[in-house]
Amino acid sequence: GLAYDISDDQQDITRMGINPIMMSAGELESGNAGEPAKMCCLFINDLDAGAGRIGVCTGIFR
């Protein structure tokens, strides 16, 4: 299998002024069925591959 190192992404996110909090999906589950879910944010890695068309700089984010 492939190993993924998220440390570079965490550094980039921190530079943008965002404080990432890593957690497992199990931490979002409730022990009581029917209890409202907790709020979360989805981080999509490699977003520039699909949304990287910015003028003449296609796919380049630095």
UniProtKB/Swiss-Prot annotation:
TM region positions: none
GO MF: ATP binding; ribulose-1,5-bisphosphate carboxylase/oxygenase activator activity
Keyword presence, ATP-binding: yes
Keyword Nucleotide-binding found: yes
Location, primary (coarse class): plastid
GO CC terms: chloroplast stroma; thylakoid
Keywords for the protein's UniProt record, in alphabetical order: ATP-binding, Chloroplast, Nucleotide-binding, Plastid
InterPro entries (UniProt xref): RCA-like (IPR044960)
Places the protein is found: Plastid, Chloroplast stroma
Family the UniProt entry places it in: Belongs to the RuBisCO activase family.
Function: Activation of RuBisCO (ribulose-1,5-bisphosphate carboxylase/oxygenase; EC 4.1.1.39) involves the ATP-dependent carboxylation of the epsilon-amino group of lysine leading to a carbamate structure.
Listed name of the protein: Ribulose bisphosphate carboxylase/oxygenase activase, chloroplastic
UniProt lineage: Eukaryota, Viridiplantae, Streptophyta, Embryophyta, Tracheophyta
